[in-house]
Amino acid sequence: KLYCISLVCGSIKKSFINSKEKVEGAISCNDEEEVLEKFIEEIKNLDPDIITGWNVIDFDLAYLSKKCKKLKIPFDFGREPGQCNIRIEENFFRDSKVDVSGRQVLDGLNLLKVSFIKVEDYKLDTVAKSILGEGKLIHAQGTEKYKEIDEAFKNNKKKLIEYNLK
């Protein structure tokens, strides 16, 4: 289930949450379709040159692409009309790719792998602690992480939003 999508663009921070109830710090949406539609509309309105994130292609965009397909929503947030094309590579030594008209998608995970920065592992929390001096709000790994995110969505949506934006 799609709970929430957040974005940061300069000083703008927005979260679109799948919740009929009003949630402080977020734009409440009635269902997954509305979350996706508002997120895509916001990307087009903000018109960024670069879209970036940690494992943004293999996780975030892959998930959003599948969800859009399932809900019959165009996976289209480029500058020109047309679907964004995503190619997920199963091979660790090849990077997945996404084509978004008029925008570059830079995956922080892939960029770090080719940099000269040495880290213990490539988990977002580890890298955030190493480079920024602090980790993510939710520190659990694997299934425990998903349980904690699920719990935040059910009982503390503000925490989920803060986790997404940090």
Where are the predicted features?
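Short, flexible loop/turn elements at secondary-structure junctions
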Residues: 9, 57, 110-112
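Active-site-proximal helix-loop-helix substrate-binding element of RNase H-like nuclease domains
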Residues: 15, 22-30, 47, 61, ...
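Acidic, metal-coordinating catalytic cores used for nucleic-acid/nucleotide bond scission
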Residues: 52-61
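Structural beta-strand/beta-sheet cores of well-ordered domains, especially the beta-sheet scaffolds
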Residues: 3, 52, 102-104
